[in-house]
C-alpha cells in the first residue's frame, strides 16, 4: 500500500509550509488526485487518519478532487478524454496519446490557523 508513503509526503509538505508561514494548525487539506494514477481515494483517507496522528494535521479534514484523464493526440491534434493509460485516441483510433492530466497527486489547498 503505497498510499501511506504518499500521505507521509503530504504531511512533510505541510510541515515545511508551517515553518515558512508559521501557522499552528491545519483544518483542511484538499488534494487533486488523478483518476488514472495508482492511488485509491479511500486508502488515502484511511492512511491520512493514521499518518497525521500526532502531527500538525491531526484532526484535519481531507478533501479529494478527482482529475479525469486527458491526453493530446498528435494525429488529430486534439485534447481527448482518456479512461485508461496508454489508450488509443477515442476520436481517430491512433496511438499513443500523450497523457496531459489524470496522473497527478497535488496539494491544491489548505485551510490553516
Curated annotation (Swiss-Prot):
Coiled coil: none
Superkingdom classification of source: Bacteria
Signal sequence annotation: none
GO terms of biological process kind: protein maturation; protein modification process
Positions bound to Ni(2+): 2
InterPro entries, alphabetized: HypA/HybF
Molecular-function GO terms, alphabetical: nickel cation binding; zinc ion binding
Pfam families: HypA
Keyword presence, Zinc: yes
Amino acids binding Zn(2+): 73, 76, 89, 92
Keywords recorded for this protein, A-Z: Metal-binding, Nickel, Zinc
Gene3D superfamilies membership: 3.30.2320.80
Purpose: Involved in the maturation of [NiFe] hydrogenases. Required for nickel insertion into the metal center of the hydrogenase.
The family this protein is said to belong to: Belongs to the HypA/HybF family.
Protein name: Hydrogenase maturation factor HypA
Organism: Methylocella silvestris (strain DSM 15510 / CIP 108128 / LMG 27833 / NCIMB 13906 / BL2)
Lineage: Bacteria, Pseudomonadati, Pseudomonadota, Alphaproteobacteria, Hyphomicrobiales
The encoding gene: hypA
Amino acid at each position: 500500500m503505497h498510499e501511506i508513503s504518499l500521505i507521509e509526503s503530504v504531511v512533510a509538505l505541510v510541515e515545511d509550509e508551517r515553518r515558512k508561514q508559521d501557522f499552528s494548525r491545519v483544518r483542511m487539506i484538499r488534494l487533486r488526485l488523478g483518476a488514472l494514477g495508482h492511488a485509491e481515494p479511500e486508502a488515502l483517507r484511511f492512511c491520512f487518519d493514521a499518518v497525521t496522528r500526532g502531527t500538525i494535521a491531526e484532526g484535519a479534514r481531507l478533501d479529494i478532487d478527482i482529475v479525469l484523464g486527458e491526453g493530446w493526440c498528435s494525429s488529430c491534434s486534439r485534447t481527448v478524454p482518456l479512461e485508461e493509460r496508454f489508450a488509443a485516441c477515442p476520436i481517430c483510433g491512433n496511438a499513443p496519446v500523450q497523457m496531459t492530466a489524470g496522473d497527478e497527486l497535488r496539494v491544491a489547498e489548505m485551510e490553516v490557523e
